[in-house]
């Protein structure tokens, strides 16, 4: 039976694979697993029940799914603070700020509106390790907690959830944004009610698109996966910069004044150099994934910043950061984690600090983005192959080594087998697009030949 939890919680078609029954069951299982710690026991010792935060993005299905989650928790003896529609990083912050035992976010992030998901955070607002998710999944089929009478949980509105998060974001800023004109694309998502307020309070002149969520238009032609509209809006408004969020606002991508995209790698480069200059980049180290652009690594090396690589996924970036106390990490996709202020990727926080660097250095985004050269990166997906043998086939390994030798210090090769299907991703970076395309296709042919299913 396939694992229920994916790389970012449980996701599926709302009311299809992800039903109210499953949401309720997951909440009950989470309650059984996550209330065994000292914090929950200390609450019980003084006559209090364990506490959880529940929140959601504005998808129409989020209403019944979050209600099912809250019901599952309360029926297990957990007091629930319902924060309503807020960004995922806001929920993570509130779990820590309110000293809750854990929390649940109902969102499918950048996925289309018919999908939804359930993401569970541990005490402190951190993502759950795989082993804890496995225990929750096992508990779906075990006996649930069944308190009665005064021992059942209460559900109440978390009335000042947004205000707490907004004040936290503003307090994190090292420099105000006065004089900067920004276009915000809120993806018709969870950022629509918060991001414009925060950027305005920080001093920026704000134009907003994608700020009218109706439950079904989340990520629909807007947000961090659809940057064309934001680029057009930046040019039309004559703005200095554009900031794009995704549906739950845990990502940030940017557009410069000329309409060019500034991706997560470039944002990390800008923030890392600024933090190093201000003495805030712990151990002069940046955590990135194996998919981050070669240009990021070269630029950081030249600036005296060490880059530590992890597997793809912000959870692995965060594990590395937490394990060694690093202060900055992220992904090319725009998940950027600033651990001094957040326990997960925070698109609003990232955008604020990016604009803060523009204001502090009195430079345009295009000027700051010159901190790194973006190498052409070509990805070819090879399907229907034995992906388990990708690192053991000798002739394939020789072909990879030959391409690496030809590229030298001006490129790199990465073969990534899928964890869920017979697919191998062939990625090549080179100094020019033509070389990257040619070598990626050549290697893809070798993969097909050697690993044919």
UniProtKB/Swiss-Prot annotation:
<feature type="active site" description="Phosphoserine intermediate">
    <location>
        <position position="109"/>
    </location>
</feature>
<dbReference type="GO" id="GO:0005975">
    <property type="term" value="P:carbohydrate metabolic process"/>
</dbReference>
<dbReference type="InterPro" id="IPR050060">
    <property type="entry name" value="Phosphoglucosamine_mutase"/>
</dbReference>
<dbReference type="InterPro" id="IPR006352">
    <property type="entry name" value="GlmM_bact"/>
</dbReference>
<dbReference type="GO" id="GO:0005829">
    <property type="term" value="C:cytosol"/>
</dbReference>
<keyword id="KW-0597">Phosphoprotein</keyword>
<keyword id="KW-0413">Isomerase</keyword>
<dbReference type="GO" id="GO:0008966">
    <property type="term" value="F:phosphoglucosamine mutase activity"/>
</dbReference>
<dbReference type="InterPro" id="IPR016066">
    <property type="entry name" value="A-D-PHexomutase_CS"/>
</dbReference>
<dbReference type="InterPro" id="IPR036900">
    <property type="entry name" value="A-D-PHexomutase_C_sf"/>
</dbReference>
<feature type="binding site">
    <location>
        <position position="250"/>
    </location>
    <ligand>
        <name>Mg(2+)</name>
    </ligand>
</feature>
<dbReference type="GO" id="GO:0009252">
    <property type="term" value="P:peptidoglycan biosynthetic process"/>
</dbReference>
<dbReference type="Pfam" id="PF02880">
    <property type="entry name" value="PGM_PMM_III"/>
</dbReference>
<dbReference type="InterPro" id="IPR005841">
    <property type="entry name" value="Alpha-D-phosphohexomutase_SF"/>
</dbReference>
<dbReference type="Pfam" id="PF02879">
    <property type="entry name" value="PGM_PMM_II"/>
</dbReference>
<feature type="binding site">
    <location>
        <position position="246"/>
    </location>
    <ligand>
        <name>Mg(2+)</name>
    </ligand>
</feature>
<feature type="binding site" description="via phosphate group">
    <location>
        <position position="109"/>
    </location>
    <ligand>
        <name>Mg(2+)</name>
    </ligand>
</feature>
<comment type="function">
    <text>Catalyzes the conversion of glucosamine-6-phosphate to glucosamine-1-phosphate.</text>
</comment>
<dbReference type="InterPro" id="IPR005845">
    <property type="entry name" value="A-D-PHexomutase_a/b/a-II"/>
</dbReference>
<protein>
    <recommendedName>
        <fullName>Phosphoglucosamine mutase</fullName>
        <ecNumber>5.4.2.10</ecNumber>
    </recommendedName>
</protein>
<comment type="similarity">
    <text>Belongs to the phosphohexose mutase family.</text>
</comment>
<dbReference type="InterPro" id="IPR005844">
    <property type="entry name" value="A-D-PHexomutase_a/b/a-I"/>
</dbReference>
<dbReference type="InterPro" id="IPR005843">
    <property type="entry name" value="A-D-PHexomutase_C"/>
</dbReference>
<dbReference type="Pfam" id="PF00408">
    <property type="entry name" value="PGM_PMM_IV"/>
</dbReference>
<keyword id="KW-0460">Magnesium</keyword>
<dbReference type="GO" id="GO:0004615">
    <property type="term" value="F:phosphomannomutase activity"/>
</dbReference>
<feature type="modified residue" description="Phosphoserine">
    <location>
        <position position="109"/>
    </location>
</feature>
<dbReference type="GO" id="GO:0000287">
    <property type="term" value="F:magnesium ion binding"/>
</dbReference>
<dbReference type="InterPro" id="IPR005846">
    <property type="entry name" value="A-D-PHexomutase_a/b/a-III"/>
</dbReference>
<keyword id="KW-0479">Metal-binding</keyword>
<feature type="binding site">
    <location>
        <position position="248"/>
    </location>
    <ligand>
        <name>Mg(2+)</name>
    </ligand>
</feature>
<dbReference type="GO" id="GO:0006048">
    <property type="term" value="P:UDP-N-acetylglucosamine biosynthetic process"/>
</dbReference>
<dbReference type="InterPro" id="IPR016055">
    <property type="entry name" value="A-D-PHexomutase_a/b/a-I/II/III"/>
</dbReference>
<dbReference type="Pfam" id="PF02878">
    <property type="entry name" value="PGM_PMM_I"/>
</dbReference>
């Amino acid at each position: 039976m396939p694992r229920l939890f994916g790389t970012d919680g449980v996701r599926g078609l709302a009311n299809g694979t992800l039903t109210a029954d499953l949401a309720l069951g997951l909440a009950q299982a989470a309650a059984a697993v996550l209330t065994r710690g000292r914090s929950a026991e200390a609450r019980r010792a003084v006559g209090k029940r364990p506490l959880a935060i529940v929140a959601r993005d504005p998808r129409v299905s989020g209403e019944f799914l979050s209600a099912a989650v809250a019901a599952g928790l309360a029926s297990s003896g957990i007091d629930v603070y319902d924060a309503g529609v807020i960004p995922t990083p806001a929920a993570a912050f509130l779990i820590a700020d309110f000293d809750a035992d854990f929390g649940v976010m109902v969102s499918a992030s950048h996925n289309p509106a018919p999908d939804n998901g359930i993401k569970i955070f541990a005490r402190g607002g951190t993502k759950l390790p795989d082993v804890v998710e496995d225990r929750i999944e096992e508990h779906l089929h075990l006996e649930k907690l069944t308190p009665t009478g005064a021992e059942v949980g209460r559900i109440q509105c978390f009335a000042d959830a947004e205000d707490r998060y907004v004040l936290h974001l503003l307090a994190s800023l090292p420099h105000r944004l006065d004089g900067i004109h920004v276009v915000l694309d809120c993806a018709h998502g969870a950022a629509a009610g918060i991001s414009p307020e925060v950027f305005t309070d920080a001093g920026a002149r704000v134009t907003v698109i994608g700020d009218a969520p109706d439950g079904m238009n989340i990520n629909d032609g807007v947000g961090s996966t659809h940057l064309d509209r934001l680029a057009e809006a930046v040019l039309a408004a004559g703005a200095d910069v554009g900031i794009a969020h995704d549906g739950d606002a845990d990502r940030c991508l940017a557009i410069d004044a000329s309409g060019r995209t500034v991706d997560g790698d470039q944002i990390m480069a800008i923030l890392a150099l600024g933090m190093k200059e201000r003495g805030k980049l712990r151990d002069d180290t940046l955590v990135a994934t194996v998919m981050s652009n070669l240009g990021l690594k070269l630029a950081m090396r030249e600036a005296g910043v060490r880059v530590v690589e992890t597997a793809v996924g912000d959870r692995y970036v965060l594990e590395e950061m937490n394990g060694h106390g690093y202060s900055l990490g992220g992904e090319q996709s725009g998940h950027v984690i600033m651990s001094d202020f957040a326990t997960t990727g925070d698109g609003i926080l990232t955008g604020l600090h990016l604009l803060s660097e523009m204001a502090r250095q009195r430079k345009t985004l295009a000027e700051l983005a010159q901190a790194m050269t973006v190498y052409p990166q070509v990805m070819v997906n090879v399907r229907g192959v034995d992906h388990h043998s990708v690192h053991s086939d000798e002739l394939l390994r020789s072909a990879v080594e030959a391409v690496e030798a030809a590229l030298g210090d001006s490129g790199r090769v990465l073969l990534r087998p899928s964890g869920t299907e017979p697919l191998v991703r062939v990625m090549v970076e080179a100094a020019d697009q033509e070389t990257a395309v040619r070598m990626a296709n050549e290697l893809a042919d070798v993969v097909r030949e050697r690993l044919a299913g």
